[in-house]
Amino acid sequence: DMDNVKGAGAAGGLGSALMVFLNGTLKSGIETVLDLVDFDRRLEGVDVVVTGEGATDWQSVFGKVMQGVGIHCKAHGISAVAIVGSMGKGAEDIFEYGIESMITTINGVMTLPEALDHAEELYLGAARRLFRMLRAGRKLSVAVNGVNSNDSHKRAE
């Protein structure tokens, strides 16, 4: 019964057809991509991963990039943060999957066409704000814990 198979109805039921007629198997798209790029190996020695998407909302926890990246980072004890275009209803649900914080590119009231016209500028501004926050966090860590920034790659056990 294909009605109970997660993902079988995606792409107009293409997954179901492949499973039934070609003995195919289903695998999460983001998991496939992360495997193809050897993501877990690339996390070795990494302190923080920056990911993102255009609009983060309740749907973001259903097999999208941020969820997959967050899950893998969390499994390796690595901080994951995100730059997103906008945050909608349920956006903070992504925090349960390893994304620790997110910042929007939108820095004021604007229409979608305005945001798209200034996408590069808005993205760079968000990236600057994000890395300033990370730097502030590192300084705070040094002040509170005496952790030298040169030792940041060492993880507490």
Where do the protein language model's features map onto the residues?
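N-terminal loops that bind phosphate or other acidic moieties
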Residues: 1-157
